Swiss-Prot record:
It comes from Brucella abortus (strain 2308). This is UDP-N-acetylenolpyruvoylglucosamine reductase. The keyword Oxidoreductase applies. The lineage of its organism: Bacteria, Pseudomonadati, Pseudomonadota, Alphaproteobacteria, Hyphomicrobiales. Gene3D superfamilies: 3.30.465.10, UDP-N-acetylenolpyruvoylglucosamine reductase, C-terminal domain, Uridine Diphospho-n-acetylenolpyruvylglucosamine Reductase, domain 2. Pfam families: FAD_binding_4, MurB_C.
Length: 322
């Protein structure tokens, strides 16, 4: 069991006094994640801007755990909470999107994907329509190479600006990001703060039409009005995760307040009172049943983080829990 956030802040008394951002101890992560479930952050820090974030990183000893989140769209937080500091980049300091030349946009890491799509439309830049259908933020899109409708983030990235654990600035090229399917090999210790994107000049009517098609498809096949973290598992080579989940009889499967959506069975939803334990147990149950049915190992696309409550544990799949 972790100590209180107040106790952690007391240990660092004086180190953080010059920060302009907001420090909040013992903040429920259920308030900032789309699943609306999970335990508290020991301390939540919302920096004012990149300079404030750098000062924070320089002040906090490296042995204290630190986790960065964006808008919380693909996070599953365990019920025991998240020890150390959770850094949440705010829209005010990290959410701007601006056109910097004829074909380029610069976006803050806290900008919603949809805002980038809208800015690209306004600038007459094609190649960003897929962001209109991704329920997340740019920082997460950079970290996991988010994609949809056959397009991926890596196709648009020129360079990424980041801070390391010591608060120093790094600029990473597209190659430095080490992109693969739903993955970047950039150091997990780097905190992305902004990105320079490259688009292709296009007709606004064509771009708007492509965005409308993305939105229509999403609303038709995905549970957009539910408390969900988006796609639960990555697609496996040669097949889609939802097909394997469906074949294993897991469409609509429930554990406590968690359910695999009837509309799209690769979407896990909180039906109202799910705990983090419910959600993760459901996911591992699905993985086990899919493996038993087809021999395919599904890999989580949703990021799981935090501590289990005392006495709780979840076995990894491979038939151990079913």
């Amino acid at each position: 069991m972790m100590e209180s956030g107040e106790a952690l802040l007391k240990k660092l008394d004086g180190r953080l006094s010059g920060l302009r951002g907001r420090l909040t101890p013992d903040t429920g992560m259920d308030k900032i994640t789309w699943f609306r479930a999970g335990g508290p952050a020991q301390v939540l820090f919302q920096p004012s801007d990149e300079e404030d974030l750098s000062a924070f990183l320089k002040a906090v000893p490296e042995e204290i755990p630190l986790l960065v989140v964006g808008i919380g769209s693909n996070l599953l937080v365990r019920d025991g909470g998240v020890p150390g500091f959770v850094v949440r980049l705010s829209a005010k300091g990290f959410g701007e999107v601006e056109q910097v030349c004829d074909t380029q946009l610069r976006a803050g890491a806290a900008a919603p994907d949809k805002r980038v799509a809208a800015a690209a439309l306004e600038a007459g830049l094609a190649g960003f329509h897929f962001y209109h259908g991704i329920p997340g933020g740019i920082g997460g899109a950079l970290r996991m190479n988010a994609g949809a409708n056959g397009v991926e983030t890596r196709e648009r990235v020129v360079e990424v600006r980041a801070l390391d654990r010591k608060g120093e600035v790094h600029v990473l090229s597209n190659a430095d990001m080490g992109y693969a399917y739903r993955h970047s090999s950039a150091s997990p210790d780097l905190i992305f703060t902004s990105v320079l994107f490259e688009g292709v000049p296009g007709e606004r009517d064509d771009i708007r039409r492509a965005m409308d098609e993305v939105q229509h498809h999403r609303e038709t096949v995905q549970p957009v009005r539910e408390k969900t973290g988006g796609s639960t598992f990555k697609n496996s080579e040669g097949t889609s995760a939802w097909k394997e989940i469906d074949k294993a009889g897991c469409r609509g499967l429930r554990v406590g307040g968690a359910q695999m959506s009837e509309m799209h069975c690769n979407f896990m939803i909180n039906t109202g009172n799910a705990t983090g334990h419910d959600l993760e147990t459901l996911g591992e149950t699905v993985r086990a049943r899919v493996f038993e049915n087809s021999g395919i190992r599904l890999h989580w696309e949703i990021k799981r983080l935090g501590l289990f409550r005392e006495g709780e544990q979840i076995e990894e799949f491979l038939g151990k829990i079913v």
